[in-house]
Every structure is written in structure tokens, then in C-alpha cells.
């Protein structure tokens, strides 16, 4: 059975969590809301990526930085994680394909820009899916 430590090792290649990460992961897996304020390079992404892979639905990550979305998704895909981003750097055809694949259950983690949350089409998409975390 998968657990946070096995995901951490198998997917991300780390033997152990950094200080504070395991508590955040445990709380998220318990369904608690968490605000984690950590310095740059402290491993915030692992704190939501590990639970995202253990929870049943999709995790939506809201990020205002297109370059960060691309970097994060690229690293996740390279690690074998089904991830995608949806922002204005994509063409209309690319957006439609991404949403089509998301509806078919291709992705575990989807990165979106904050303004995407206000778009009726995305709201309908989110209402039709099982969203585990935002």
C-alpha cells in the first residue's frame, strides 16, 4: 500500500522529509486545511505533491507564475506524475485538449493561474470532477 514515505522515495527520490514537511503532508491527508509559510527552497511543493498522489481525485494548484507552472509540471512529468498546466501561454486548441484529457482522468495535478478560477468554463469543469485539494 502506498504511503507518504513510499511516494517520497519512489516518485521524488528522497529518503526522508525535510523539517515540517511530514506534518503538513499528514494534515492534508487527514483532510485539514493547511497554510504553510516556508522559505524558498524549503520544499513546499513536496508538501502538496505527495498527498496529491495519495488522494483519490485531482489536485488543483493555483500559481500566478507561468514559468513556475511550466517548471513544476515538467519536473512532475519527468518523475512519471500525470500533471498539466492551464494558462494563457497555451493556444485555444492546447487548452481544449488539456481539458478534454483532464475530463478523461489523465491528470492527478493541474496547475492554473488565479484568474482561471473565475472562468465559468473552468468552474463547470471543477464541479464535474472529484477535486481532492486546492
Predicted regions located by residue number:
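Hydrophobic positions in the central parallel beta-sheet of the AAA+
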Residues: 36, 60-61, 84, 110-112, ...
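Conserved pre-motif I regulatory segment
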Residues: 1-39
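Residues at the C-terminal ends
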Residues: 29-30, 54, 78, 104, ...
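Walker A/P-loop
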Residues: 31-50, 60-65
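Conserved helix/coil segment N-terminal to the catalytic DExD/H
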Residues: 42-45, 49, 90-133
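Conserved Walker A/P-loop ATP-binding site and its immediately adjacent core
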Residues: 57-79, 88-90, 94, 113-118
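Short glycine-/polar-rich loops that comprise or flank the Walker A/P-loop
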Residues: 56-58, 79-82, 107, 130-132
